[in-house]
Amino acid sequence: MAEKEIGIIFDLEANGLYKDATEIHCISYYDTAAEEMFSFNDQCPGKGLSSPITTAVQYIQQADYIIGHNIIGYDLPLIRKLYPFFNPTGVIVDTLLLSRLYHSRLMSIDKERNWKHMPLQLYGRHSLEAYGYRLGEYKGAFSKDTDWKEWSQEMEDYCTQDVNVTRRLWKHFTPYLNGSR
């Protein structure tokens, strides 16, 4: 990624999986050019407390690079479903696919490393939760305690933490992509 190009590393939280979702509760993203994190929701429009989801969707659409974990399988299709105008032209980088490509033997790697704090059921998994343990950027337990029906500040904080984990994962894969590993 060139210096002037805008990369958006993002995640979203919605009220269900693709088939059932009718609302995106929040979007958080890290702008690689500005080196800044942003969060968006539709909970307090016009009160200066948040920017609307459509603003985030427009920023993502205009980015030169769109980076996230499972964004090809979930996030981008969901945005397209709920915001039909969404038509990104930037390069899409899915860290889930990079993980499967570059770490196809993840179970063996995890067994060799014998992670001190990672639960055994996460060994061999390409999930963001598993990578949070591997990279020392734990994503939190919010997802285990919610039904996803309503927005909450805890949900938005969880979304932002997912972006932090994805940033670390993107940094991990960058040497693979530029040929230095």
Question: Where are the regions a protein language model picked out?
Answer:
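Active-site-proximal helix-loop-helix substrate-binding element of RNase H-like nuclease domains
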Residues: Y18, Y29, E35-I53, D64-G179
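Entry/capping segment at the start of metal-dependent catalytic domains
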Residues: M1-Y29
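Short alpha-helical segments and helix-capping/turn motifs at coil-helix boundaries
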Residues: F10-E13, S51-T55
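A short, aliphatic-rich alpha-helical micro-motif
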Residues: I60-Q61
